């Protein structure tokens, strides 16, 4: 009888967790946890990337060499000495060795489970008749990792084992680094001085958390604080220290520190030993002692887990669906709102989020905590420049500075004000926000409404003689940095996005009784659309832009970068594209950009530098913005299809492709668990099929707020307006029904959607048929049971 192989990827605990049962099939598959001060992403094999805020991002476990400070990178490369969390198990009688979760020994295992949960990460590894269980959790308010390690004897004989947790600390500082065992704290404490050269930086760095601690609840039998002493000549797969009777009790003196502790145990058949550890940064020993007292006990771990579960529950979202696609249900109900919550809760753990990211990430909070979205508008608009322009980044803490890409001038940030406000108003109906007076650093004190008008005026002024929007050194596409660096280049996408934004704002002006302003902004939108049609329509799609030297690009004649998705999506949203133009565009999009893994941002990819477009053309073929399945661009297209109507099959197909699975083949190709949407999957499907579909593994993306919005307002068709809730579901043709529970303005809507013999959507509230698919006069606290029949 052959043993049935476990399913590679599976949901458990009613979808609250996802498991993977093989550490080699998807080696980069990972889970992530966060609180408002830290984040950690950890792979199924045990490699980890963690950072915390003080207030700028910092590390407490480092690479083994000097590490560049940078933003989170896609497609991380893992290697033997990459930071990670491991435990070695050695049979003291036979000398055999394995490690959990899988690295660094990579020994064969009898059972492997990596379980990514919403509130913790968990492993079960069985090898050599021994079971190891590892659990990692976080506190709600502090920077620390809480680890539980259980070791059980599954064999039929007593076992003598050494259990050696190994948490490498890495190269901390070229100025000063050390580590030693601290008897008072019962753990290893590594210390460093953050490198600096300017005198002023001494005071800036004085109170940084320059210590990393690894604390044990049970005193170990021996320890190692020096990486070289632990690893020796054996290498990490068979460290020299584990070939000795005990660890040597080393320290590290301007040497690379590590944290390895060893327990010698004897386990009878079925016996188990449990250990708890605390790993994190601190400023001094007093802080470490306080963390130990608060957390490092069984009761402390249990209370922390309960508190963290309550913290995560606050991000549960406003939607629950039952559809024919159970994997999609699981993602929508459990994992999508979690990722949306992450973005709005911590703003990607940066002190200067890009303005467009900040506004779009907080757009998702409309469906979780609308007050957070409201506050974000006030924070952002207070930093408006005197010209009406928005800055490239929003500063969130005192002393923060614009860094990285925010030092490069982009021209699109004003566009996102009305675009994201529309979702806020749809969800809350809170037009009082517009009357809030907001002072700025310029000394003026204007209402939100007045500031938005200034932003729209800035967009209208920032156009050339043709009426096309200047691009400077980038628009939404950050690396399109050389189209307009001489001051003349224009963006086709931004011209259309400006029209869309102006039209949204004109509706708001109408609502506020400002009909003259509404007329002016609509005329501006019409002018942008007309300019796009005159100068950018290429017969079957809209061009991406015109360079400083007056070269139109993103057209049929281009061998690379021929057709871009964003201009087509936003021409639908802005109204620039007529029905006839849309009929021409959609087949071209299908032909040029569709892949089995979603829709490419453009195609074909660039294979060499194009100096009048910029560094986007230098990116690796099919990666990031160079013709990847860039999900943010994809969701704009999906949103435009739902707004257009009668495109639900095309929209749903693309929406579903954003999620890995459900086949093992798809999971393996993407290499990612279906617990988040990454910023991209590799594109260039025709040119580089071997790598196409590979996940970036980067969960920071503006995609997810839009995905949640598209599911709520598009697929489910439950969109708010000034009077109540509009009901216009857009089910794919393969579905005959779905059920939705939607929380909206304090009320609960239970919606049963079914196909029937009707020509238009009909809604029954209890026994009453509504005159239109529109629920008005909604009462908070009430439950509405709606039966919806669709054609």
Swiss-Prot record:
> What is the name of the protein in this document?
Cellobionic acid phosphorylase
Active site (catalytic residues): 478
Classification via Pfam families? Glyco_hydro_36, Glyco_transf_36
- Output the PANTHER family linked to this UniProt entry: CELLOBIONIC ACID PHOSPHORYLASE, CELLOBIONIC ACID PHOSPHORYLASE-RELATED
KW Flavoprotein (keyword) present: no
Gene3D superfamilies registered for this protein in UniProt: 1.50.10.10, Glycoside hydrolase, family 65, N-terminal domain, Maltose phosphorylase, domain 3
Origin superkingdom? Eukaryota
Kindly state a single biological-process term from the GO annotations of this entry. cellulose catabolic process
Q: Name one GO molecular function term.
A: carbohydrate binding
Q: Which organism is it from?
A: Neurospora crassa (strain ATCC 24698 / 74-OR23-1A / CBS 708.71 / DSM 1257 / FGSC 987)
InterPro entries, alphabetized = 6-hairpin_glycosidase_sf, 6hp_glycosidase-like_sf, Gal_mutarotase_sf_dom, GH36_catalytic, GH94_Enzymes, GH94N_CBAP, Glyco_hydro_65_N_sf, Glyco_hydrolase_94
**Annotated catalysed reactions:** 4-O-beta-D-glucopyranosyl-D-gluconate + phosphate = D-gluconate + alpha-D-glucose 1-phosphate
Q: In which pathway does it act?
A: Glycan metabolism; cellulose degradation
The family this protein is said to belong to: Belongs to the glycosyl hydrolase 94 family. Cellobionic acid phosphorylase subfamily.
Q: Does the keyword Glycosyltransferase apply?
A: yes
Quaternary assembly: Homodimer.
Alphabetic keyword roster: Carbohydrate metabolism, Cellulose degradation, Glycosyltransferase, Polysaccharide degradation, Transferase
Described function: Catalyzes the reversible phosphorolysis of cellobionic acid (4-O-beta-D-glucopyranosyl-D-gluconate), a probable step in cellulose degradation. May be part of a metabolic pathway where cellobionic acid is converted into alpha-D-glucose 1-phosphate and D-gluconic acid to enter glycolysis and the pentose phosphate pathway, respectively. Produces 4-O-beta-D-glucopyranosyl-D-glucuronate from alpha-D-glucose 1-phosphate and D-glucuronate with low activity in the synthetic direction.
